Design a protein with these regions (language model features):
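Short, structural beta-strand-to-alpha-helix junction motif
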Residues: 19-24, 65, 323
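Short structural boundary motif marking the start of a folded domain
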Residues: 2-6
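Short, contiguous acidic and Ser/Thr-rich linear segments
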Residues: 11-19
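Short strand-turn-strand beta-turns centered on an Asx-Gly dipeptide
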Residues: 8-11, 54-56, 258
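Fe-S ferredoxin-like electron-transfer domains
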Residues: 48-207, 215-245, 249-251
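Catalytic alpha/large subunits of respiratory electron-transfer oxidoreductases
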Residues: 91, 95, 148, 153, ...
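A basic, amphipathic helix-loop patch mediating RNA/tRNA/ribosome contacts
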Residues: 21-55
């Protein structure tokens, strides 16, 4: 894509031709409100508050692409009226339980209601009873749901599970007279909102890989972790940046911490968060944090037994599912005490790398997952992406969905999740041990 120049509120902005106006504005520190849009997902036009004026015509910044010389105005009297009406509609029948809602203090509905100056309500419709649902690790409260569809988009475009969809809401239809009296976009958004809720894509059970990304992207308190629900207020927590210790991918995350209880000042991890516009977590990273709260790993007797075992051993056999830090410890032990390190997986991978380099004249270490995200053709050999490296799976799926890419997936075990990425992906299930042949 070629470089272009556009003007947003009089400010010259460099952009790539075809880049969404919303992303150009964000890159240049220009505020355009948006609830439904996620950077790594397809636009859904669910919220419509990203309305702007481009060359005199109203467009949606999340879906309209920048063109050279385009002049954009982010706020006019009509746009302000539309945005305010949209936020009023979102607030219709929304439960006034902010004091106990798990999202209170970091709720985008709260923030935008204040941002748009909504201090009175002009609209109403009879509410319907909506029963909360528990989907394993996830709690869904449809009464709090604003149907922004971020969870649906994340599950499809980021993760690849496609486990969520919009389902019929039921209840009274909107008064037809509202179409003539309300701002156009506010009415269209309300009409859609009034017909829909979020539900499992297949039956009544949520069939997914339990990554919890839908919880992370939810702007309100509709989707929360069942373990975190009603345990803490957001403003009581201290976010500690860290790297996930469950595998060598080292995903960036935040541990939200506070004291264990009123009579126990020891810090405790209450939940894990991530920068979902840039990186997604797997279920291990998001939900597997309680090992830090337990005391088993602090057993001095067990630790001494492990030390004695190391003293007697001359060989260490280990699995590939270890962190970079653990691998470094093994290397240091080998250098200092002369241990033999045995890992069958690593040996097979070494053989594969030798064959790959001889065949292609290239090394696999010349790229990272960010390059996968931006690729249009990907080949995966030897790894069961669903469990071996979920982040690689997310990148694979995202490239196929967002770049209209294609790919080949080689593995002995059939994987319905990977097969569901798209029609341009060919999955080849071969006999075990033929990975090097496929290269």
């Amino acid at each position: 894509m070629s470089d272009i120049t556009i003007k947003i509120d009089g400010k010259e902005c460099k952009a790539k031709e075809g880049e969404y106006i919303l992303n150009v504005a964000r890159a240049n520190d220009i505020f355009i409100p948006a609830i439904c849009y996620l950077t790594r997902c397809s636009p859904t036009l669910a919220c419509r508050i990203c309305l702007v004026e481009a060359d005199g015509k109203q467009v949606y910044a999340c879906n309209a692409k920048a063109k050279d010389g385009m002049e954009i105005t982010t706020l006019t009297e009509n746009i302000a009226e539309e945005r305010r009406a949209i936020m009023e509609v979102y607030d219709v029948n929304h439960p006034l339980e902010c004091g106990v809602c798990d999202q209170s203090g970091e709720c985008e509905l709260q923030n935008y209601t204040l941002e748009m100056g909504v201090d009175e309500q002009h609209y109403a419709i009879r509410d319907t009873h909506k029963v909360p649902q528990d989907w394993g690790l996830i709690h869904y409260d449809p009464a709090l749901c604003i149907v922004c569809e971020r969870c649906v988009s994340a599950c499809k475009d980021m993760i690849g599970d496609s486990a969520l969809k919009t389902v019929p809401r039921g209840g009274d239809p909107l008064d037809k007279e509202l179409k003539n009296s309300m701002p156009k976009d506010a009415y269209a958004m309300w009409n859609k909102l009034n017909k829909s809720l979020i539900g499992p894509a297949k039956g009544d059970t949520l069939e997914c890989t339990d990554c919890g990304e839908c919880i992370a992207v939810c702007p309100v308190g509709a989707l929360v972790s069942s373990d975190f629900q009603y345990t803490s207020n957001a403003w009581e927590l201290t976010s500690i940046p860290a790297a996930c210790a469950h595998c060598s991918a080292g995903c960036h995350l935040y541990y939200d911490v506070k004291h264990t209880s009123i009579d126990n000042p020891e810090p405790k991890i209450y939940r894990v968060k991530n920068e979902w516009n840039y990186v997604s977590l797997c279920g291990a990273g998001r939900f597997g944090y309680d090992f830090e709260n337990r005391t088993e790993g602090k057993d001095e007797t067990a630790f001494q037994k492990a030390i004695e075992a190391f003293k007697k051993a001359d060989t260490i056999r280990f699995s590939s599912v270890i962190s970079n830090e653990e691998a470094l410890i093994l290397q240091r032990l080998k250098e200092k005490y002369g241990y033999k390190l045995i890992n069958e997986d690593a040996k097979r991978f070494q053989n594969f790398m030798n064959i790959f380099s001889k065949t292609t004249g290239r090394t696999l270490y010349s790229a990272d997952l960010n390059d996968v995200h931006h690729s249009d053709f990907i080949v995966s050999i030897g790894a069961q992406l669903k469990s071996d490296n979920p982040r690689a799976r997310y990148a694979f799926n995202n490239a196929i969905k967002m770049n209209k890419g294609a790919g080949l997936y080689f593995h002995p075990v059939k994987d319905p999740v990977v097969e569901g990425f798209g029609k341009n992906l060919i999955c080849i299930n071969h006999k075990p041990g033929l990975d090097t042949v496929s290269s």
